[in-house]
Amino acid sequence: MSDNRSRRIAKELADVQQDKQAGIQVWTINDDISHLKGMFRGPEGTPYEGGYFVVDIEIPIDYPFRPPKMNFDTKIYHPNVSSQTGAICLDILKDQWSPVYTMKSALISLQSLLCTPEPSNPQDAQVAQVYLQNYQQFVRTAREWTSSYAAAPAGVDLDAENTEFGGIDPNIITNLQQFGFSTELIVRVLQREHIKSQEDLKDYPNGINGILDQLLH
């Protein structure tokens, strides 16, 4: 893996960790920064509201000049997502990709796609047909799937105020856990470094990378 590619991915991960407002989480799988998972909540006012949607992310060797490969791990009833495989039809993940895009911007685009499906360019033709011909049935089924398949993962709440760990933002703890560190170690280091909020983390030298250095030593 090239140093430039590695640095780019590491920077994107750090940016996601520090951006609390985006409501996006990204973490590595088995410490492999070419294979990640992303997660976001279903948008309010849609059949996906209240759901937590996990996306598998594979980073190509020539990233960011080629788009990441993204598939929904969470089953979702949507015209632009295969109900069988989770494959996604979204232009910026194909021919409209640009190196200025990031994993975060791609995940935000996926979240926006849940607000504005494009049934004229479907990934799942059967779902698109229901969307166009019987919209109320589409909404009912999408809500049922959200309820059945998109429950919050254990221990994850993107909005929660933490009281258990001395007021430390739970998103910080959850994000650091994805790097394989124990909760006990994370809390101990964050308390020692006086990190409770995303703002504290932003002001910390080197941000999330600075905390990762502390956890490794």
From Swiss-Prot:
Catalytic activity as recorded in UniProt: S-ubiquitinyl-[E1 ubiquitin-activating enzyme]-L-cysteine + [E2 ubiquitin-conjugating enzyme]-L-cysteine = [E1 ubiquitin-activating enzyme]-L-cysteine + S-ubiquitinyl-[E2 ubiquitin-conjugating enzyme]-L-cysteine
Biological process, per Gene Ontology: ERAD pathway; protein polyubiquitination
Annotated keywords: ATP-binding, Cytoplasm, Nucleotide-binding, Nucleus, Transferase, Ubl conjugation pathway
Pathway(s) served: Protein modification; protein ubiquitination
Broad class of the protein's primary localization: cytoplasm
EC number: 2.3.2.23
GO MF annotations in UniProt: ATP binding; ubiquitin conjugating enzyme activity
Active site annotation, chain numbering: C89 (glycyl thioester intermediate)
GO cellular component terms attached to this protein's record: cytosol; nucleus
Highest taxon in the source lineage: Eukaryota
UBC core domain residues: 4-151
Function description: Catalyzes the covalent attachment of ubiquitin to other proteins. Functions in degradation of misfolded or regulated proteins localized in the endoplasmic reticulum (ER) lumen or membrane via the ubiquitin-proteasome system. Cognate E2 conjugating enzyme for the HRD1 ubiquitin ligase complex, which is part of the ERAD-L and ERAD-M pathways responsible for the rapid degradation of soluble lumenal and membrane proteins with misfolded lumenal domains (ERAD-L), or ER-membrane proteins with misfolded transmembrane domains (ERAD-M).
UniProt similarity note: Belongs to the ubiquitin-conjugating enzyme family.
Protein name (record): Ubiquitin-conjugating enzyme E2 1
Native source organism of the sequence: Schizosaccharomyces pombe (strain 972 / ATCC 24843)
Lineage of the species this protein comes from: Eukaryota, Fungi, Dikarya, Ascomycota, Taphrinomycotina
Gene: ubc1
